[in-house]
Amino acid sequence: MAAPLQYPLCCQTVTFYHADPAAHTITRTVVQGVHFDTRRRETAAGGSGPAGSAATAFLLVIPEKHAAFGRDYTLEPHDRVFAGTGPEVSYTQWLDFTPAKVPGLAAVQYVDCKTAAGQAVHVEAGGWWTRSGSGAHSLSN
């Protein structure tokens, strides 16, 4: 039997936000024991995108042993992630609660549950956005 996966970099706290348009509510969940990595990508002259264009990207890893997906939290595209313990946000504040306006905030574009030997081991989530706050831009552009 293989040794269990270790997550030495998963020592951060994040806050998840999920909007429910039908109920006009925002669900806020604080999760500890995660790895939240942000990075900046700039396009040089001669690349496939306009020279000087930039995007910010993030990768989030949530070990199942720290928080169980679907039980302790939910996460899906269009949700938002804040580095650290984030503020309470009302539904009327949601449209202004964007990565372009709030430092430390990221917009989720994908969520992928990873398994080993048929058991969930961690969830990966990520996304990217430009200075204007728009997302879903290919990092290969």
Report the location of each language-model feature:
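Short, acidic/charged, Gly/Pro-enriched secondary-structure junctions
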Residues: 70-109
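N-terminal disorder-to-order initiation segments that are Gly/Lys/Arg-biased
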Residues: 1-66, 103, 110-141
